[in-house]
Amino acid sequence: RIKIGLFDQLSRL
């Protein structure tokens, strides 16, 4: 999924 990738980056912050 692409939406998950976006959330993954936010979680890294």
From Swiss-Prot:
Expressed by the venom gland. It comes from the Eukaryota. Changing K3R: Similar order of inhibition potency on different Nav isoforms; alone or. GO terms for cellular component: extracellular region; host cell presynaptic membrane. Keywords: Amidation, Ion channel impairing toxin, Neurotoxin, Presynaptic neurotoxin, Secreted, Toxin, Voltage-gated sodium channel impairing toxin. Its main location: secreted. The keyword RNA-binding does not apply. The modification Leucine amide is found at L13. It is found in: Secreted. The keyword Secreted applies. Changing R1K: Similar order of inhibition potency on different Nav isoforms; alone or. One of its GO terms (molecular function) is sodium channel regulator activity. Inhibits sodium channel (Nav) inactivation. Shows two types of inhibitory activities on channels. Inhibition of insect DmNav1/para and hNav1.6/SCN8A shows a large increase in the steady-state current component without any increase in the slow component, whereas inhibition of hNav1.1/SCN1A, hNav1.2/SCN2A, hNav1.3/SCN3A and hNav1.7/SCN9A shows a large increase in the slow component with only a small steady-state component. Is 5-fold more potent than alpha-PMTX for inducing repetitive action potentials in lobster neuromuscular junctions. Does not inactivate (neither slow nor steady-state components) hNav1.4/SCN4A and hNav1.5/SCN5A sodium channels, although some very small inhibitory effects are seen for the hNav1.5/SCN5A isoform. This is Beta-pompilidotoxin. It comes from Batozonellus maculifrons (Solitary wasp).
